[in-house]
Every structure is written in structure tokens, then in C-alpha cells.
Amino acid sequence: MNNNNVTEATSRAQIRPYYDPDSFNAGYSAVFKPDEGVVDPHGYTIASKLNVINSSPTTKRMANALFKSSPMKKLSNSVNDGLSLEGSNGEITGLNNFEWAELVNIQKWRKIFEQLLDMFFRKYFQLLIQQPFDVARLLIQVGEFKIFKTTVDTNKPQAPIILRDEEGDGAAREGEEDAYDEEEIDFFPIERKIAEANSTAPIMAEETDHSHHEPTDISLTIAPQSLHTIDVINALFDQEGIRGLWKANNTTFIYNFLSLSIDTWFTGLLSSFLGVPDPYFMEVINSPDISKSFILALGAGVFTSIILLPVDLIRTRLIVTSFKKKKNVKTDGKNMVTNTRSLRQLIRCWSWRKNGVSIPLDMWSLTILQSINNSFFNKLFDLVIYNQFHIEKYSQTVMYNTMKFFSKSLELFIKLPLENLLRRCQLNYLLNDQRLSFKVDSTELIVKPKKYNGIWDVIRNNSNTNRGQLWNGWKVGVISLICGYGLQMMNKVDINMEQEKF
């Protein structure tokens, strides 16, 4: 080591014989010396001027112990020479206090808390706007409604106009008007006819559908005038009130939060075993092994959806049941929760050991397929458009957002039938599984449930139902896509319009 230093100094002296590191001054405010570090014109190092070094004698002893055995002995001596002997200035009293001051930084934690609070309010407010439409879509997917259209027969001849003697019929007309005033006026004839038509629905359901043992309660069911989302929302508002529009709002928020958290935890855990970067910190397109990263994203999504399956069941239960019945009944000596609105109480009733084996294969399959569909389009989209079309979201924002819109439209077209079948399967499971502690009684439903006999029954159309009903709720999805696409286009940054300032 010493020989190398001597050789380096000799070669440096041969190149610049006039240069002396100890006395050479180029006019800089600080000079770097290999043996001492950065030194100011007065001969003191930068390390000797730190507040943590000048704080107390305790810190001086720690610094001496740190640099005493170091090969940079001259640097240690310069630090000791520059230490102040006047004691502490009252700000930091030692090295331990310095570390705690960095950890308990009020400004830093305040900024983090403000960011979390801002994100919380943004997500929750977004859910408040979206939830009424999602509730209406789920009711359309699982409910069967009798919609009667009122038509006017144009071929029927109109009644002829009869001329009468006003003076002779005056007394009779006054009597008719008095009788007419006493009659009760029906201001809503259409709604009355729909309610009367739906009143016969339990009798028909009892004869045709043997899977549901009890008919629905007519006083709780909603009767929309059509299957349009707005009509369903109006009917729900008339039946359940304002809070009926935000059914399971907090449960949905908790489900979304847990879904993101668990999926992030799974990807972070499994990425270390697969030897690939976490997809949440590095996009799949930038991964050194794209296939492993893509499989990791799909697997984490599937595991997350399976773990949160009980919460998804509870969310469906809260939406399809009414607020008006709240009681606990005993069935076979066991307390069965019939219509509690508490997520904490309902999740306590779930047991994977008891209820996991009773989950039908259809529900497992539909849950996994729905998760794969979401992960496939979200994770594989950037990879496909970059490799096939050479489109990148930072340099080609308009084209990227347009391609993303078409990709989301295709995802919605595939997602709706899977979601429709999954909701029917969940409601059928909630109605008929006897081992389920929070089993739903059919008299608590606000809709008449559609018949569900399995996926193959729907595919083969054995029930002679309209297969177009599998895409119920597509209007809400399309409106959401269009609004999201419009926001992305308005928030885009036009690179050509920006000027770089120096």
C-alpha cells in the first residue's frame, strides 16, 4: 500500500514538478487531500464543522473511538482539533437523539398523513358516486322483473260525441259531479298495474321454481317500470329510501382496499422466490423475465379473489336484502343471522373449514375466471401494444389512451357474462346452503331471484331464457369507460406546447 502511494506521488511529481499538495492553492474554498478529506483554507475538515460533532463531549468521544483505529488517522486528528469546547448548543445532545430526531420528523409524517388522507377521500368520494349504479346493475343481474308496457290501441274506434240539453241535464250533472268528487282518484295507474302484476309472481315462482322454498315478500320487492338503470334506482329509492342507493358502500370500500393490499403483499412475497421485480414497482414490460412477471400477476390476483370470496358474498347479501327485517332466528338449535347489516358480525359467522367445502364448483370457476380476465387485460395490455404496435404511454399519450379504451371495452364485453353468472350463483348459494350461518331467507329479498341451475344450463339455454340478459348493466359500464377516457384525454400533457426553461 505504501509502495503504491510512493509510486503515485513520484509519477505525479514527474508530470508536474511545481505542484506541492500541501502548499498548492488554486483559489478554491475547499481542497481535497487524500489523507484528510475536504479541507477549508484554515485547515479544518468539513466533518469537524457538523453540528452533530460539535454537540457534546459524548459525541467527541464517540468520534474519537470511531476514527482512532481507522487508517485515515490524519482525518481523525483534524476532526478532534476542530471540535468545539464550549459544549452543546441545545438543539441535539447526542448521536442517539440525532437518529430519533430523524425518525420522529413531524413534517415528514405530516406530509405522509396528508397524502394518505387525500387518497382516502378521493377513493371514497369516487365510490359514493359509483355505488348507486353498481347496486342497480347487480339487482338487474340477479332479479327477475315483470315489465308491462302500456300501449294504446289505435284501431279501436273512439266513442261518439253526444249532444245533450244543458238545462234539462243540469240537476243530473250536479249529482254526478258530487259523486265524482267523493271518488278516490288514482294518480298512479301504471305503478298500480305493475304492483298487481308482481303480486302474482310468488304464485308462479312457487309452481315453477322448486329450489326456493318460500316466495318473496311483495311488500319488500321493488317494481321498476323498465330495466333501465335510472328506473331501477328510482324504484329502489321509493322502496328503501335514500340509504338504499348506497347499500354495502363501506363493505365495497373495505373490499377494494383489501384487494389492493393483499395483491400487493402477494406480489412482493412471491417475486423474491421467482427472481423477478415486483410488478407494482416495475411494469411487466420492463421486467427481465416477462413471462414470470405475468404469471406472478395472474397468480396473485387469483389468490386475492379467493381469499376475499367471503367478503364478496357478504357484499352481495347486503345489496339484495332489505333494511326492514332485522332479527335472529333459531334453526336446528343454532342461531342463524338472517338480516344483520354488520360486516364484522357476518364475517365472524364464516368458517373456511365448515363453509369452504360447501362452495359450489361454479362459484370457484367464475371467481377465478373473473380475476384472470381483470389481470389479463390490465397487465398484458402495455406489453402487447408496445411489442406489436410500438406505442408507449409517455410519448404517444393520445394513441395509448385510445387503445386502452378499446381494450377496456373488450374486457367489459367478456367481464359482464362472468359477473352476471357469478352474482346469480352467489345468490343461489346464499338462499339454499343450509350450513351457511348468514343464509338469506327469500322473504328478505327486494327482488325475485332468477333461476340458476349451473353454468352449463345457461350455455345450453335449457331454461329458454334470453341470453342477452347476460350483458345486463352494459350501459353503466360503457358510460364509465367513456368518462374515464374523457378524463384521460383532458389530463394529457402536450409535449409540443411545453417550453423547457433554463
UniProtKB/Swiss-Prot annotation:
<dbReference type="GO" id="GO:1990626">
    <property type="term" value="P:mitochondrial outer membrane fusion"/>
</dbReference>
<keyword id="KW-0812">Transmembrane</keyword>
<feature type="transmembrane region" description="Helical; Signal-anchor for type II membrane protein">
    <location>
        <begin position="294"/>
        <end position="314"/>
    </location>
</feature>
<keyword id="KW-0472">Membrane</keyword>
<feature type="topological domain" description="Mitochondrial intermembrane">
    <location>
        <begin position="315"/>
        <end position="502"/>
    </location>
</feature>
<keyword id="KW-1133">Transmembrane helix</keyword>
<dbReference type="InterPro" id="IPR023395">
    <property type="entry name" value="Mt_carrier_dom_sf"/>
</dbReference>
<protein>
    <recommendedName>
        <fullName>Mitochondrial fusion and transport protein UGO1</fullName>
    </recommendedName>
</protein>
<feature type="modified residue" description="N-acetylmethionine">
    <location>
        <position position="1"/>
    </location>
</feature>
<feature type="region of interest" description="Binds FZO1">
    <location>
        <begin position="1"/>
        <end position="294"/>
    </location>
</feature>
<dbReference type="GO" id="GO:1990627">
    <property type="term" value="P:mitochondrial inner membrane fusion"/>
</dbReference>
<comment type="subunit">
    <text>Interacts with FZO1 through its cytoplasmic domain and with MGM1 through its mitochondrial intermembrane space domain.</text>
</comment>
<keyword id="KW-0735">Signal-anchor</keyword>
<keyword id="KW-0007">Acetylation</keyword>
<keyword id="KW-0496">Mitochondrion</keyword>
<comment type="function">
    <text>Required for mitochondrial fusion as well as normal mitochondrial morphology by bridging the essential interaction between FZO1 and MGM1. May coordinate fusion of inner and outer membranes during mitochondrial fusion.</text>
</comment>
<dbReference type="GO" id="GO:0005741">
    <property type="term" value="C:mitochondrial outer membrane"/>
</dbReference>
<feature type="region of interest" description="Binds MGM1">
    <location>
        <begin position="312"/>
        <end position="502"/>
    </location>
</feature>
<dbReference type="GO" id="GO:0008053">
    <property type="term" value="P:mitochondrial fusion"/>
</dbReference>
<keyword id="KW-0677">Repeat</keyword>
<keyword id="KW-1000">Mitochondrion outer membrane</keyword>
<dbReference type="GO" id="GO:0005739">
    <property type="term" value="C:mitochondrion"/>
</dbReference>
<feature type="repeat" description="Solcar">
    <location>
        <begin position="288"/>
        <end position="383"/>
    </location>
</feature>
<feature type="topological domain" description="Cytoplasmic">
    <location>
        <begin position="1"/>
        <end position="293"/>
    </location>
</feature>
